């Protein structure tokens, strides 16, 4: 239980921290990657939600 709680805290903290504070800007050559970089902090949450979808698919055995 502690591991799941820790994972939730880490995911939420990383998503909140990185989306609320911007200290750096990508160089001009990589400006087209801005939408992908903005989405990257949310990716761990997708894995967390995938675990529930997977468990629902196997009927929470």
UniProtKB/Swiss-Prot annotation:
SUPFAM superfamilies hit by this protein: Photosystem II reaction center protein K, PsbK
Keywords linked to the UniProt accession: Chloroplast, Membrane, Photosynthesis, Photosystem II, Plastid, Reaction center, Thylakoid, Transmembrane, Transmembrane helix
Subcellular location: Plastid, Chloroplast thylakoid membrane
Sequence intervals crossing the membrane: 40-60
One GO cellular component, as annotated: chloroplast thylakoid membrane
Pfam families cross-referenced by the UniProt entry: PsbK (PF02533)
Topology term for the membrane: Single-pass membrane protein
Proregion residues excised on maturation: 1-24
Subunit structure: PSII is composed of 1 copy each of membrane proteins PsbA, PsbB, PsbC, PsbD, PsbE, PsbF, PsbH, PsbI, PsbJ, PsbK, PsbL, PsbM, PsbT, PsbX, PsbY, PsbZ, Psb30/Ycf12, at least 3 peripheral proteins of the oxygen-evolving complex and a large number of cofactors. It forms dimeric complexes.
Function: One of the components of the core complex of photosystem II (PSII). PSII is a light-driven water:plastoquinone oxidoreductase that uses light energy to abstract electrons from H(2)O, generating O(2) and a proton gradient subsequently used for ATP formation. It consists of a core antenna complex that captures photons, and an electron transfer chain that converts photonic excitation into a charge separation.
Protein name: Photosystem II reaction center protein K
Biological classification of the source: Eukaryota, Viridiplantae, Streptophyta, Embryophyta, Tracheophyta
Gene that encodes it: psbK
């Amino acid at each position: 239980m502690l591991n799941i709680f820790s994972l939730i805290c880490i995911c939420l903290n990383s998503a909140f921290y990185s989306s609320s504070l911007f200290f750096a800007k990508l160089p001009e050559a990589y400006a087209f990657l801005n939408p992908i970089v903005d989405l990257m902090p949310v990716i761990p949450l997708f894995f967390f939600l995938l675990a529930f979808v997977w468990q629902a698919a196997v009927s929470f055995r």
